[in-house]
C-alpha cells in the first residue's frame, strides 16, 4: 500500500477490509466519497462503520460486498483474496 502504512493491526471480523482500503486509496477516493457512492447503491454505512470495516473489525454483508466491488470497480473475488 505504499506510503500509507496502517497504524493499527487488522482485526479478524472480515477478510476484505485491507483490499477495500487498497482499492480506495489507489483510486484517490476518500472514505466520505466512498460512503456517498455506496449510498447511491442503496447501502448506507456510517464513517465509523467504514473505518471498522477497513480495519477488519466489522463484519461485512453480502450486499455491502457487492456494492463495494461495484463502486471500487474491482472483482468480488479480488476483494475476497481469491484472485
Language-model regions: role of each:
Residues 31, 54, 64:
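Acidic-residue sensor for enzyme active/binding pockets
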Residues 57, 61-78:
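DNA major-groove recognition helix of helix-turn-helix/homeodomain DNA-binding modules
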Residues 18-40, 67:
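Short basic helix-loop element that most often maps to the first helix and adjoining turn
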Residues 20, 34-35, 50-53, 79:
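Conserved hydrophobic/aromatic packing and binding residues within compact polymer-binding modules
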Residues 39-60, 82:
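Recognition helix of helix-turn-helix/homeodomain-like DNA-binding domains
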Residues 17, 28, 44, 59-62:
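Residue at a beta-strand N-cap/secondary-structure junction
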Residues 1-27:
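A short, Lys/Arg-rich alpha-helix, primarily the initiator
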Amino acid at each position: 500500500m505504499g506510503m500509507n502504512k496502517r497504524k493499527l493491526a487488522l482485526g479478524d471480523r472480515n477478510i476484505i477490509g485491507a483490499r477495500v482500503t487498497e482499492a480506495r486509496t489507489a483510486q484517490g477516493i476518500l472514505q466520505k466519497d466512498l460512503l456517498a457512492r455506496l449510498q447511491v447503491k442503496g447501502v448506507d454505512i456510517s464513517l465509523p462503520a467504514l473505518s471498522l470495516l477497513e480495519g477488519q473489525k466489522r463484519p461485512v454483508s453480502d450486499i455491502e460486498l457487492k456494492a463495494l466491488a461495484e463502486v471500487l470497480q474491482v472483482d468480488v473475488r479480488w476483494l475476497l483474496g481469491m484472485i
